[in-house]
Amino acid sequence: MSMLFYTLITAFLIGIQAEPHSESNVPAGHTIPQAHWTKLQHSLDTALRRARSTPAAAIAARVAGQTCNITVDPRLFKKRRLRSPRVLFSTQPPPEAADTQDLDFEVGGAAPFNRTHRSKRSSSHPIFHRGEFSVCDSVSVWVGDKTTATDIKGKEVMVLGEVNINNSVFKQYFFETKCRDPNPVDSGCRGIDSKHWNSYCTTTHTFVKALTMDGKQAAWRFIRIDTACVCVLSRKAVRRA
């Protein structure tokens, strides 16, 4: 709303400077035609109508989108060293069902740019044979609202949420895995002899290549994301008589 206000003020000031205050200030043969004032008035009326009809929130969102609209060359995604099975650029959210968690899916006829050959990922507890259990319960989800992350140098960087590729807006998704519960059972990890061991489940991390902001330009960086849930063991102190 403030940008439209400044535009109206600028146009108004230009009109004041051009308006003749008296006949003596206007050189002979250089009078401003009436059509100029009519056109200026029409432009001001149109701008006022748009300002009244457009919500302030919509204007702010549009301006923010223009400042964050980063165009990326699609040839960047053809470099094998920049591909990661845990990073995906897509126009729509990836499927969440366990039986459709395919990284090679296509949305709206356009395949993701950084598609890989890894077939499926389960978004819930992995499937085991009868009688087999996992020592820790994990949950895996596609994260599409990541704004900041820690890079490989330990610095906090800004992650690009959306990029413009071939005039289409692609969102950057990260496939993250974390522990569902640090203690799946009362004693800690499942199946651990609590008489001799202390145990608990913890989320581990790895670094993946992602598009981040470097000043006013997009840049590839290694950022840390959650990738696994493991059991940590420590031997209990032996009590001697």
UniProtKB/Swiss-Prot annotation:
Subcellular location: Secreted; Endosome lumen
Keyword Disulfide bond: yes
Residues annotated as signal peptide: 1-18
GO molecular function, one term: metalloendopeptidase inhibitor activity
Sugar attachment sites: N69, N114, N166
Propeptide position ranges: 19-121
PROSITE patterns: NGF_1, NGF_2
Intrachain disulfide bonds: C136-C201, C179-C229, C189-C231
GO biological process terms, semicolon-separated: cell surface receptor protein tyrosine kinase signaling pathway; modulation of chemical synaptic transmission; negative regulation of neuron apoptotic process; nerve development; nerve growth factor signaling pathway; neuron projection morphogenesis
Keywords: Cleavage on pair of basic residues, Disulfide bond, Endosome, Glycoprotein, Growth factor, Metalloenzyme inhibitor, Metalloprotease inhibitor, Protease inhibitor, Secreted, Signal
Source taxon at top rank: Eukaryota
One cellular component term from this protein's GO annotations in UniProt: extracellular space
Glycoprotein listed as a keyword: yes
Quaternary structure note: Homodimer. The homodimer interacts with a single NTRK1 chain. The homodimer interacts with a single NGFR chain. The NGF dimer interacts with a single SORCS2 chain (via extracellular domain). The NGF precursor (proNGF) binds to a receptor complex formed by SORT1 and NGFR, which leads to NGF endocytosis. Both mature NGF and the immature NGF precursor (proNGF) interact with SORCS2 and with the heterodimer formed by SORCS2 and NGFR (via extracellular domains). The NGF precursor (proNGF) has much higher affinity for SORCS2 than mature NGF.
Stated family: Belongs to the NGF-beta family.
Function: Nerve growth factor is important for the development and maintenance of the sympathetic and sensory nervous systems. Extracellular ligand for the NTRK1 and NGFR receptors, activates cellular signaling cascades through those receptor tyrosine kinase to regulate neuronal proliferation, differentiation and survival. Inhibits metalloproteinase dependent proteolysis of platelet glycoprotein VI.
Name of the featured protein: Beta-nerve growth factor
